Amino acid sequence: MIITIGGLPGTGTTTTSKLISEKYGLNHVCAGFIFRDMAKERNMTLQEFSSYAETNTEVDNEIDRRQVEAAQSGDLILEGRLAGWILKKSDIKPDLSIWLKADPMVRCIRISERENENVDLALEKMISREASEKKRYKEIYNIEIDDLSIYDIVIESSKWDANGVFNIIEKAIENLKA
């Protein structure tokens, strides 16, 4: 089974992916972790590395390559804002493609708690990062990140806790056509 899950920062994709991975024994591959590791390798902050990635397409190419390679082996949950798009462009059809969304301030509060930052700083970083990513996705892939038409399910994650979001997805997985 191949599942993709995407969403902007703070929507709960990592928490949800881990729950799905544990329940169904799927390998968890996260584009964000790959991106963060690459930033650390270059001794850059996420904002610095996002700016660097805007003019250095090898960053996205490497992340894409790793995602496609992982998906070809099957039995995984692929987490990333473009995971669904990358597989579509590579002619790999996931069994289920999910997008999580949440109110920007809810996301900001979640990020500030996760990163142990004050809310104002988290908001500033979030806005900067998302603008950088949106620009990069359009320029490199001709993808509008706001186009959710490729997803089977879109969930407003601020309405439920992590288990509530997982329960919705669990029902969807259980009811997939064989």
UniProtKB/Swiss-Prot annotation:
* UniProt keywords, alphabetically: ATP-binding, Cytoplasm, Kinase, Nucleotide-binding, Transferase
Give any Pfam family that matches: Cytidylate_kin2
Q: Which SUPFAM superfamilies match?
A: P-loop containing nucleoside triphosphate hydrolases
Record keyword Transmembrane helix present: no
Per its record, the protein catalyses: CMP + ATP = CDP + ADP; dCMP + ATP = dCDP + ADP
Name any one GO molecular function.
Answer: CMP kinase activity
Task: Report TM segments.
Answer: none
- InterPro entries, from UniProt? Cyt_kin_arch (IPR011892), Cytidylate_kinase_dom (IPR011994), P-loop_NTPase (IPR027417)
Binding-site residues for ATP, renumbered to this chain: G7, L8, P9, G10, T11, G12, T13, T14, T15
One GO cellular component assignment for this chain's record is: cytoplasm
User: At the top level of its lineage, which domain of life is listed?
Assistant: Archaea
| Biological process annotations from GO | pyrimidine nucleotide metabolic process
Coarse class of the protein's main subcellular location? cytoplasm
What are the subcellular locations of this protein? Cytoplasm
- Its Enzyme Commission number? 2.7.4.25
The family assignment reads: Belongs to the cytidylate kinase family. Type 2 subfamily.
- Name of the featured protein: Cytidylate kinase
Q: Which organism is it from?
A: Methanococcus maripaludis (strain C7 / ATCC BAA-1331)
Name of the gene: cmk
